[in-house]
Regions:
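Acyl-donor-binding surface of acyltransferase catalytic domains
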Residues: 41, 45, 50-151
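Conserved beta-hairpin
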Residues: 34-51, 179-192
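Short amphipathic alpha-helix that is part of the acyltransferase structural core
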Residues: 1-22, 128-171
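Conserved acetyl-CoA-binding loop-helix of GNAT-fold acetyltransferases
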Residues: 67-81, 216-229, 251, 255
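Conserved hydrophobic beta-strand within the GNAT/NAT acetyltransferase core sheet
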Residues: 208, 238-242
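A conserved beta-strand-loop-helix scaffold within acyl/acetyltransferase catalytic domains
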Residues: 169-212
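Catalytic phosphate/metal-binding cores of nucleic-acid and nucleotide-processing enzymes, i.e., regions
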Residues: 264-268
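Conserved active-site alpha-helix within GNAT-family acetyltransferase domains
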Residues: 100-114, 221, 244-262
């Protein structure tokens, strides 16, 4: 297994010809979001393990029957990936596959692990839907992170949300250049943000973080309307991904106008 240089990421684009076209993977390949890619062969990769920093997890893409790759993957995880993750404060290995065949393969190669699995749901934008974001009075104010009239760094709890965003983007400059972000303010505190988590040439994903004390007040909905309106104006597709158990996220996606389009498995096991 070899770690690719960022300038060579494009070489694995063809490995996504089958299965789910994860923006979380494509954004790494296109060097829009921070991550890492490990392959079986630098010159002619057939199978890849893609690390996404924002998701704090991996994706298998390419040939799921690559015997040499499959033979060595557990050894590679035990000796390299375990250290790679622990340096980031992560004590588990999380992975998804791009195809149903990969899901079967994951079950086989990690059969000796205490493998946990759950379903993830993918929502895409219903093109027949119209956005109704008419101005309304709120107890809070909503600003774009690009609004230079407001110093977002001046809010008392900005550092927390800065950590959330930099996990996905590396630094705020990248987000301002390539992404979208709106935040809600109550007094001198930020109480929620909605942002494009991953960006590809034609798609943006949405992420939301709302202060626990301010949930179930419609803040996420109004922030998301601002973000998705901007993204649609750019002519890009929208992508929403959440756990099957996350009913509030599903309800919000549907309220915004998304429709469920795909499902897939995500897997996890602890590392020692």
């Amino acid at each position: 297994m070899i770690k690719m240089l960022a300038r060579d990421y494009h070489k694995i684009s063809t490995l996504l010809s089958d299965g789910i076209k994860y923006p979380e993977v494509i954004s790494i390949i296109e060097n829009n979001n921070p991550g890492a890619i490990f392959v079986d062969d630098i010159s002619n990769p057939n199978t890849a393990l893609v690390w996404n920093q924002g998701m704090r997890g991996f994706y298998f893409i390419g040939d799921n029957e690559n015997k040499l790759f499959l033979k060595n993957i557990n050894l590679f995880i035990n000796h390299y990936i375990t250290m790679f993750l622990k340096e980031k404060g992560i004590n588990h290995f999380e992975v998804s596959g791009s195809t149903s065949a990969w899901e079967e393969t994951i079950g086989v190669i990690f059969r000796h692990k205490n493998l946990q699995a759950w379903r993830q749901l993918i929502y895409t934008w219903n093109k027949k839907n119209t956005i109704n974001d008419s101005p309304k009075e709120h107890e809070y104010k909503i600003y774009s992170l690009r609004d230079e009239k407001i110093n977002y760094r001046g809010f008392s709890n900005w550092q927390y949300y800065n950590q959330v965003l930099t996990e996905f983007w590396g630094d705020i400059t990248q987000l301002l250049h390539k992404g979208n972000c709106y935040y809600a303010v109550d007094g001198f505190q930020i109480i929620g943000i909605c942002y494009s988590g991953f960006v590809t040439s034609n798609t943006k994903t949405l992420g939301i973080e709302i202060d626990e004390k301010h949930r179930n007040k419609g803040i996420g909905y109004h922030l998301a309307l601002k973000c998705l309106s901007d993204i649609l104006d750019e002519g890009r597709h929208l992508w929403w991904d959440c756990m099957n158990e996350n009913l509030p996220s599903q309800l919000l996606a549907e309220k915004l106008g998304f429709i469920k389009s795909q499902e897939y498995n995500c897997y996890r096991f602890n590392i020692s």
